[in-house]
């Protein structure tokens, strides 16, 4: 017996709901039982809100997007996002951030097969001063690269590069800022060039029990097709220690304020971040 697309969707939604409820219960228990952590844990929670903090981390971010095409298809993306800071002088770091997507996409129209595989890798290099500015601002800038690592049907099949930058400020538990990049393709057999701007304004608040509430958008403007894709994400995260290792769990939802025709309407997110403080 082969499950229909509707039965698959219902099963996936039930699984997602169970996952969300379980995580929320774990967070509630952690909040009720959380002991006072030392100052270094408070600093760790703060660094988690900083995309260019000097902190080795491995986030595993799962995204379920629903409502694609006339078949209301689902797309699942696991973003593997290791972050590696390197000290290059007494005053400067370079922060290397990768996004390695693993994708399962149902066919959004009848007759189009489901696809599973690797997406194109994006790698960013942020050169950042170790100390904030006199006004408390943290910033970094450098190049970003697009590698055509994806499997057929999930890749632009283009090499790309461009500039990237981030600026943020942290005060009284609040973190706010903007991460941006622009990628132009310069080689590759893909039929359509890549010419895209990515904008991620973000604001977050971390409580004294290391619970973080975050609101952001992950907006992309495709200059080739004159199209916006604007998911608005609302997320809650909890920092815990499990077996002595600091781990952050995050859950959230998103709504697409603007999107190309046939793209998803809404989605869910669950992420686990493994931290390796020095």
Model-based region annotation:
Residues 10-23:
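Bacterial N-terminal signal peptides that target proteins for export
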Residues 1-12:
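Short, Lys/Arg-enriched N-terminal segments with co-localized hydrophobic residues
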Residues 32-38:
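Sec/Tat signal peptide C-region and signal peptidase I cleavage site
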Residues 38-278:
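Transmembrane beta-barrel domains of Gram-negative outer membranes and organellar outer membranes
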Residues 24-25, 29-32:
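Gram-negative bacterial Sec-dependent N-terminal signal peptides
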């Amino acid at each position: 017996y082969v499950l229909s697309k509707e039965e698959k969707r219902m099963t996936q939604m039930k699984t997602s709901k169970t996952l969300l409820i379980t995580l929320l219960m774990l967070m509630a228990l952690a909040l009720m039982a959380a002991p006072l952590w030392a100052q270094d844990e408070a600093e760790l929670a703060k660094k988690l809100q900083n995309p260019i903090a000097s902190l080795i981390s491995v986030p595993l971010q799962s995204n379920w997007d629903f409502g694609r095409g006339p078949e209301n298809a689902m797309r699942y993306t696991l973003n593997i996002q290791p972050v590696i800071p390197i000290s290059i002088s007494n005053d400067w770091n370079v922060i290397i951030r990768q996004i390695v997507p693993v994708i399962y996409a149902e066919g959004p129209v009848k007759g189009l097969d489901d696809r599973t595989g690797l997406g194109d890798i994006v790698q960013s290099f942020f050169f950042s001063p170790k100390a904030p500015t006199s006004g408390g601002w943290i910033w970094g800038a450098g190049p970003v690269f697009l590698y055509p690592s994806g499997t057929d049907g999930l890749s632009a099949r283009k090499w790309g590069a461009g500039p990237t930058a981030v600026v943020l400020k942290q005060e009284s538990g609040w973190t706010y800022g903007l991460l941006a990049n622009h990628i132009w393709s310069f080689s590759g057999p893909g039929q359509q060039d890549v010419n895209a701007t990515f904008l991620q304004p973000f604001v977050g608040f971390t409580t004294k029990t290391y619970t973080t509430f975050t609101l952001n958008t992950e907006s992309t403007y495709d200059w080739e097709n004159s199209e916006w894709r604007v998911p608005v994400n609302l997320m809650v995260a909890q920092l815990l220690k499990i077996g002595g290792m600091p781990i952050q769990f995050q859950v959230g939802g998103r709504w697409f304020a603007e999107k190309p025709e046939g793209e998803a309407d809404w989605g869910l997110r669950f992420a686990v971040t493994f931290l390796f403080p020095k």
